Amino acid sequence: MNDCAMKEIRRFNRYYTAWLDVMNEGSYMDTDLSWPEARILFEIYICPDITATGLCEHLRIDKGYVSRVLSKFEKDGLLTRQTVSGAKGQKRIILTNAGREESERIDRGGDRQIEDKLGCLDEDTVGQLCRAMEFIEETLSNLESEEESKNER
């Protein structure tokens, strides 16, 4: 990859994280959670049988950090953990009613954010944007698959 392309990709990453407004300290989506905490809670919401190990693998984040966040959520009454039979040391993470409500608030906030930022675009432009995002996701997923294949050999 040439230097110009690398700089452009990094510039876009900085632009997009700023556009999403995820770097602000403090609450995210009208919750008392930081962006990483909100993301972890939302992943539990959309993957109801996930374990801490599954979260770490899916989000590619540190086990210690996930453990601290899950302990905080448990203390705050947002989740419970249930031992998975036959899986040594694994516990399924289960949202409480309060955890589901918080996740739904995050979900609604995400919808509102996208509507506020992109609602003025016409359908053709939104379609182009979605196709561009699909292309990026597919390209990066293919790279991951290739890397995994190389590592298995």
Each PLM stretch: what is its role?
Residues 5, 108-153:
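Terminal interaction helix/tail motif
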Residues 21-29, 78, 83-84, 115-118, ...:
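Short, flexible helix-adjacent loops and helix caps
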Residues 20, 48, 103, 137-144:
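A structural signal for well-ordered alpha-helices, especially hydrophobic packing surfaces
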Residues 71-130:
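Charged, amphipathic alpha-helical coiled-coil/dimerization segments
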Residues 14-17, 71, 100, 134, ...:
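A specific heptad-register position in long alpha-helical coiled-coils used by two-component signaling proteins
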Residues 1-35:
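N-terminal leader segment of winged-helix/HTH proteins
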Residues 23-65, 70, 76:
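N-terminal helix-turn-helix DNA-binding core of bacterial DNA-binding proteins
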